[in-house]
Amino acid sequence: MDHTDNELQGTNSSGSLGGLDVRRRIPIKLISKQANKAKPAPRTQRTINRMPAKAPPGDEEGFDYNEEERYDCKGGELFANQRRFPGHLFWDFQINILGEKDDTPVHFCDKCGLPIKIYGRMIPCKHVFCYDCAILHEKKGDKMCPGCSDPVQRIEQCTRGSLFMCSIVQGCKRTYLSQRDLQAHINHRHMRAGKPVTRASLENVHPPIAPPPTEIPERFIMPPDKHHMSHIPPKQHIMMPPPPLQHVPHEHYNQPHEDIRAPPAELSMAPPPPRSVSQETFRISTRKHSNLITVPIQDDSNSGAREPPPPAPAPAHHHPEYQGQPVVSHPHHIMPPQQHYAPPPPPPPPISHPMPHPPQAAGTPHLVYSQAPPPPMTSAPPPITPPPGHIIAQMPPYMNHPPPGPPPPQHGGPPVTAPPPHHYNPNSLPQFTEDQGTLSPPFTQPGGMSPGIWPAPRGPPPPPRLQGPPSQTPLPGPHHPDQTRYRPYYQ
């Protein structure tokens, strides 16, 4: 062992004597190496081994050396730690990040998956990729958009934040240069499905508006009245008050309107026959038409006590149009009688019609009065007591006399009135002449018999038509409501 040790020592330091020197030199070399920071661990071990053998001064030196070594090592360790783990020192401090949030969205290229700083916008399809991918794709000779495979005419270069991408529908990804254009695209392409719904809802809304008129006859009737205003202004005024009564027959309202429109033509055709009595007859006819009760009242005068029964028989005998008409309003009444007379030959059928009408009319007119103005019935009885002829004769004079003043302005037009008189001339005048030829003078003479009898038979009509007759005392109770209704229109 010793020999081998000596050999080893000799090899190391060329002699056993030099072994100590070698050992001494080793630490020096190690120190030099320590300066180089090569092997700190073996030095410590060797110094520890040398400590007991060395003298106290050697110990002091070793201590000093150790202190330096430790110092050096500590320094080295600190630097090494800083280099290896710099975070340990700096992460102990609070860091304030300065800057502002950027609201500009960042889009990613569908080709390379990287965020796009400069867009390559395909022109007609408006899809975007990063400019590099777009140029590469174009250089390859592909004139198709990689996203939608649409042909590409050119590529636009756009900066980040200058494009607005559609994200309403996943996969659209079309880009626009302004928010307005993007919104227009959304409304045109993506909201189209919703638009039909809105349009349908609007259409549904409009139809309901039309039905209400049918449901509310008053509204539905009002427009026709306006149309008729030009032809029959007074009748229109009269129609305004009665609408509340018109609730009963909706279908009848529609029919009367049509009838009203149709008869005027017939009436216009009819005027030529008798114009001599056109004014008087016209006025009488208009009043009769407006009330429609005048003809039945005449018949009623013949049948003294029909007032109570009329309500019941009226529905059965009366034509649906007639019933609806009385309820509708005076204008309707005026027109329907014309219709009844107009369809048949003016002279002959009218006469026959009034004749059958008395029973029917007796019921119907009363029904009309019961529905709209019952007073005529009550007022009619006193005049009914006198001979029917007187009532009939008185009726025409009343009609003739008052119309000259107030009615002409109300009716405002002979054209409409002319046709009814023709129809009525055969009906009313022949009847009057047939019943009592002597009574015809009273008709012409409004002062004689007319004043007393006018109120009774024509009670219901005058309130709407003539201010004078209704004002007369004979018809105070029943007619006052009607007068209140119609006065505003005439005044």
Swiss-Prot record:
<dbReference type="Pfam" id="PF18408">
    <property type="entry name" value="zf_Hakai"/>
</dbReference>
<dbReference type="InterPro" id="IPR040383">
    <property type="entry name" value="HAKAI/CBLL2"/>
</dbReference>
<keyword id="KW-0833">Ubl conjugation pathway</keyword>
<feature type="region of interest" description="HYB domain">
    <location>
        <begin position="148"/>
        <end position="206"/>
    </location>
</feature>
<dbReference type="InterPro" id="IPR040380">
    <property type="entry name" value="HAKAI-like_RING-HC"/>
</dbReference>
<feature type="compositionally biased region" description="Polar residues">
    <location>
        <begin position="427"/>
        <end position="442"/>
    </location>
</feature>
<dbReference type="GO" id="GO:0005737">
    <property type="term" value="C:cytoplasm"/>
</dbReference>
<keyword id="KW-0808">Transferase</keyword>
<comment type="subunit">
    <text>Homodimer. Interacts with tyrosine-phosphorylated SRC substrates. Component of the WMM complex, a N6-methyltransferase complex composed of a catalytic subcomplex, named MAC, and of an associated subcomplex, named MACOM. The MAC subcomplex is composed of METTL3 and METTL14. The MACOM subcomplex is composed of WTAP, ZC3H13, CBLL1/HAKAI, VIRMA, and, in some cases of RBM15 (RBM15 or RBM15B). Also a component of a MACOM-like complex, named WTAP complex, composed of WTAP, ZC3H13, CBLL1, VIRMA, RBM15, BCLAF1 and THRAP3.</text>
</comment>
<keyword id="KW-0597">Phosphoprotein</keyword>
<comment type="pathway">
    <text>Protein modification; protein ubiquitination.</text>
</comment>
<dbReference type="GO" id="GO:0016567">
    <property type="term" value="P:protein ubiquitination"/>
</dbReference>
<keyword id="KW-0539">Nucleus</keyword>
<dbReference type="GO" id="GO:0030335">
    <property type="term" value="P:positive regulation of cell migration"/>
</dbReference>
<comment type="similarity">
    <text>Belongs to the Hakai family.</text>
</comment>
<dbReference type="InterPro" id="IPR017907">
    <property type="entry name" value="Znf_RING_CS"/>
</dbReference>
<dbReference type="InterPro" id="IPR013083">
    <property type="entry name" value="Znf_RING/FYVE/PHD"/>
</dbReference>
<feature type="modified residue" description="Phosphoserine">
    <location>
        <position position="201"/>
    </location>
</feature>
<feature type="region of interest" description="Disordered">
    <location>
        <begin position="1"/>
        <end position="61"/>
    </location>
</feature>
<dbReference type="InterPro" id="IPR001841">
    <property type="entry name" value="Znf_RING"/>
</dbReference>
<feature type="compositionally biased region" description="Pro residues">
    <location>
        <begin position="372"/>
        <end position="389"/>
    </location>
</feature>
<dbReference type="GO" id="GO:0004842">
    <property type="term" value="F:ubiquitin-protein transferase activity"/>
</dbReference>
<dbReference type="GO" id="GO:0005829">
    <property type="term" value="C:cytosol"/>
</dbReference>
<feature type="zinc finger region" description="RING-type">
    <location>
        <begin position="109"/>
        <end position="149"/>
    </location>
</feature>
<keyword id="KW-0862">Zinc</keyword>
<dbReference type="GO" id="GO:0030155">
    <property type="term" value="P:regulation of cell adhesion"/>
</dbReference>
<dbReference type="GO" id="GO:0061630">
    <property type="term" value="F:ubiquitin protein ligase activity"/>
</dbReference>
<feature type="region of interest" description="Disordered">
    <location>
        <begin position="255"/>
        <end position="491"/>
    </location>
</feature>
<dbReference type="GO" id="GO:0016607">
    <property type="term" value="C:nuclear speck"/>
</dbReference>
<keyword id="KW-0479">Metal-binding</keyword>
<dbReference type="GO" id="GO:0005634">
    <property type="term" value="C:nucleus"/>
</dbReference>
<dbReference type="GO" id="GO:0006397">
    <property type="term" value="P:mRNA processing"/>
</dbReference>
<dbReference type="GO" id="GO:0000151">
    <property type="term" value="C:ubiquitin ligase complex"/>
</dbReference>
<feature type="compositionally biased region" description="Pro residues">
    <location>
        <begin position="399"/>
        <end position="423"/>
    </location>
</feature>
<feature type="compositionally biased region" description="Pro residues">
    <location>
        <begin position="342"/>
        <end position="359"/>
    </location>
</feature>
<dbReference type="GO" id="GO:0098609">
    <property type="term" value="P:cell-cell adhesion"/>
</dbReference>
<comment type="function">
    <text>E3 ubiquitin-protein ligase that mediates ubiquitination of several tyrosine-phosphorylated Src substrates, including CDH1, CTTN and DOK1. Targets CDH1 for endocytosis and degradation. Associated component of the WMM complex, a complex that mediates N6-methyladenosine (m6A) methylation of RNAs, a modification that plays a role in the efficiency of mRNA splicing and RNA processing. Its function in the WMM complex is unknown.</text>
</comment>
<keyword id="KW-0217">Developmental protein</keyword>
<feature type="zinc finger region" description="C2H2-type">
    <location>
        <begin position="164"/>
        <end position="190"/>
    </location>
</feature>
<dbReference type="GO" id="GO:0008270">
    <property type="term" value="F:zinc ion binding"/>
</dbReference>
<feature type="modified residue" description="Phosphoserine">
    <location>
        <position position="290"/>
    </location>
</feature>
<dbReference type="GO" id="GO:0042802">
    <property type="term" value="F:identical protein binding"/>
</dbReference>
